Amino acid sequence: MKKTHGLDVNPLTDIAICCGQSEAFAAAIFSIINQGDEVLLFDPCYETYEGCITLAGGIPVYVALEPPQWTLDPEKLMRSFTSRTKAIVLNSPHNPTGKVFSRDELEIIAEGCRRWDCVAITDEVYEYITYDNQKHETIAKLPGMQERTIITSSLSKTFSVTGWRIGWAIAPASAASAIQNIHIRITDSAPAPFQEAALTALRSPIEYFETLRGVYELKRDFCMKLLGSVGFRIQFKPQGSLFLFAELPKDCLLSDVEYVEELIQQAGVVVVPGRGFFHGNESCKYQKRYIRVAFCKSEATLNAAAQKFGELINAKACPKIVY
């Protein structure tokens, strides 16, 4: 943390090791949320956040990011804070859109946290996976924020070990202690051999992270070109993460779910309907117009998907999903 973000962290008191980021996030929520507390979430967002909040008795309050660039409206955000707001969840780089929150946006979020005395809970699992010279910054490094931020992250995405379940929360000592106590009562301990492996992984040379970004950037560009060739509207180029959030072709009459079903049946290609990431105003038509594509696949898998799309185009047998 000192080398990457310039933060002083006491490893004995400020870090809680958990079974993946998911447990670290859930434990963070359980450690600070009481019945009726409000938690701000950006919409769209990763679907498990809401469940953790409601399970803890909290109330999710959604702040929509505006498509197609997924911009943050400062006034809308500030209006969402109330005396009941206990925390705000910040995932950057962002799942599903690939957005990296800018320094200006982080400053706005931090101002709301300081003004309303609430906690920022971050999900930074894609912190090393950014593109086009974008840089990830943690909100904890801003003035007055380290003492009111709980950072959660893991090995899973950076080192492609999603099954190892090694994650952590970095927080002020009192919060880290509460998170550790919750972790002990739920899963007892993260696997010790994997913790040893984690130390080796986290000491990887900078060249590893640069190579990782380069490989995924090529895969991102490959998928953008592929989807563009069959009519998808790619109006936002992912700045980070492993996902492409693409809008259905303009002339497509299907919903996101219907399109995904057709794609599976006719091409054998699987993507995720976008509506599962939206939780706010369901009257917004765009919420049923997106799909999420994961490009963290082998070259062989991506080429096979491209071939299947190509066969559909050449056969002209699939007017519902090829435009």
Please provide the spans of the model-predicted regions.
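PLP-dependent class I/II
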Residues: K2-Y323
